[in-house]
């Protein structure tokens, strides 16, 4: 467990990576632009495929973009097609979806689209959005970061809405997938979003990839049972009463009454 100067803490976890095939559309962004139940939007971008053998695949080309609900979803639906002669059209904005309550995974396929010579080039590219879940506790909010991407995220930056300025202030960073914001006020709503920073391992693939999660809000509450004290009982044979003493071994439990 890592503990930060402002009292936040987190637990370690491993990032997921995958090998890449020549001709694959290398996805670089699946970033939440708008958090909404009905009007959410996601920015998706990818790198123009490198090392493309243009002898069998001399174009024109077509990108097919698919989406599935959930960061590990498998029920893909096509949401967009892009016909191109240059392969330079490498981004879309997916709109009118529920980004507040759901994460999404995207698949991008590249086809040679010549008449009589249409075929899939390489392998599809896959990457999910960054989905943040929050669990309120006593004067705290616990978070779990969910993602399914082919690059390595080296850092997650946490931001909390400042109710005075209505801007999101940085409250800490972690390279792990759980995080706790401590020292909060019970009964007050707090809103958060996170930014991931990462990149692909191979030298010829993109670094410094930045993506954002949805906005998630939570209200801390005293929903945790008090700490169990260590109890000792002493008595004297000629006395009609017992003396009961208790103590807390965890310093954080001293005020938990």
Question: What spans do the regions from the language model cover?
Answer:
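Surface-exposed, proline-enriched loop/turn segments that connect beta strands in immunoglobulin-like
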Residues: 28-33, 228-233
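An aromatic-rich alpha-helical recognition segment common to small helix-rich domains
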Residues: 1-3, 18, 46, 65, ...
